């Protein structure tokens, strides 16, 4: 789920 964390931006 760490990959989608930067997608939050």
UniProtKB/Swiss-Prot annotation:
Highest taxon of source: Eukaryota
Similarity field: Belongs to the FARP (FMRFamide related peptide) family.
Compartmental location: Secreted
Keyword match Secreted: yes
Any single GO BP term: neuropeptide signaling pathway
Coiled-coil intervals: none
Keywords: Amidation, Neuropeptide, Secreted
Predominant cellular place of this UniProt entry's protein: secreted
Listed GO CC annotations: extracellular region
Modified residues (Phenylalanine amide): 9
Organism: Lucilia cuprina (Green bottle fly)
Tissue-specific expression: Detected in the thoracic perisympathetic organs in larvae, and the dorsal ganglionic sheath in adults (at protein level).
Protein name as it appears in the record: FMRFamide-8
